[in-house]
Amino acid sequence: MNILFAGGGTGGHLYPAVAMAERLEQLYPGTTVAFVGTERGIEATEIPRLGYRLHLLDVRGFRRGFSFSDMLNNAGVLLDFVRAVVKAAGIIRAEQPDVVVGTGGFVSGPLLAAAELMGRKTLIQEQNAFPGVTTRFLAAFATEVHLSFEESRKFFRRKQGVFVTGNPARSFTGIDQAEAQSFFGLQPGLPTLLVFGGSRGARSINNAVKTWISGAAGKANIIWQTGSLDDERLRKEVEPSATLWIGPYINDMRMAYGAADLVLCRAGASTLAELTNLGKASVLVPYPYATGNHQFFNAKALVDAGAAELVADADIALDQSRTKVFSILADPELRLRMREACRKEGRPEAALDLAGRIAGLANIK
């Protein structure tokens, strides 16, 4: 069975594809997996590191404005898209995939379009409650569309071939907390806060956490993924310690989640899938410029379930936000209630279910 995945730009689009690929390889030995991405996305480094073959397309997104500059840019984007579809068709002829799977990001569009024009079986996996424009358009022609939220159905005209299977997430279970804390050089036994804002980082979160370090010393461990955007600056301003690990990227998220009692992060759908599958208490800071404000709606679902707290991006630097975070970190009973509520929202079998659907499309039993 040959499967070709397209998805990336950010971890939110890439890691669901990786989760499905890993499960396919576990369930169906001999499966061949390849990826299509861009050189600007996280996939350019992550996919080779994971040992998969990667094809690159040159594609970028449309601007949403109506100025002359925006329209000129979008004309170029459209031309790039057509060229990318032609190149994607060549990749499909070379790989001969049984199924082409798209998980979002700019690169999914041309590969899915080429696959659908060539009559290949296609599966779209949408992570967010508010599907993107490309997903909604290509879904009309896809063999199957898989959603993470029931409420997303209303955005699609078609009724057949649309399923709610959840968001496939990487598996991070089976880690002893004290071992994980020691892995980061931290003090076992202290409550531990895990902070991250994506591969590039979140400047608002980084600036807030920088002011929290001195007050947390001796009371809590902090594992802080700064992202590439602020790494150089923060390394000059903040020193690691026995209670602080700081770095641009965490290569072993299994250990990071295993060490954490509370997670402070954005509210991307893939991150929330990982949190709910693990049952991790969290304070969510939705990215305010996400399309359709979808991170807010992703976060609200967990907040309404009692599984998380929400802090607006504009408020993260306020004293009350710091107080909220460290109050939860210091309250084991509250964290337990949040963990239990969070686990109820998870769909840990999503990767398994989707692997089965992909195999079914490939006529593999």
Curated annotation (Swiss-Prot):
Cleavable signal peptide: none
Keyword line: Cell cycle, Cell division, Cell inner membrane, Cell membrane, Cell shape, Cell wall biogenesis/degradation, Glycosyltransferase, Membrane, Peptidoglycan synthesis, Transferase
InterPro entries: GlcNAc_MurG, Glyco_trans_28_C, GlycoTrans_28_N
Cellular component aspect of the GO annotation: plasma membrane
Subcellular location: Cell inner membrane
GO biological process: carbohydrate metabolic process; cell division; cell wall organization; lipid glycosylation; peptidoglycan biosynthetic process; regulation of cell shape
Metabolic or biological pathway: Cell wall biogenesis; peptidoglycan biosynthesis
EC assignment: 2.4.1.227
Source superkingdom: Bacteria
Amino-acid positions noted as binding UDP-N-acetyl-alpha-D-glucosamine in the UniProt annotation, renumbered to this chain: T10, G11, G12, N128, R170, S199, I250, Q295
Membrane topology: Peripheral membrane protein
GO molecular function: UDP-N-acetyl-D-glucosamine:N-acetylmuramoyl-L-alanyl-D-glutamyl-meso-2,6-diaminopimelyl-D-alanyl-D-alanine-diphosphoundecaprenol 4-beta-N-acetylglucosaminlytransferase activity; undecaprenyldiphospho-muramoylpentapeptide beta-N-acetylglucosaminyltransferase activity
UniProt similarity note: Belongs to the glycosyltransferase 28 family. MurG subfamily.
Name of the protein described by the UniProt record: UDP-N-acetylglucosamine--N-acetylmuramyl-(pentapeptide) pyrophosphoryl-undecaprenol N-acetylglucosamine transferase
Underlying gene: murG
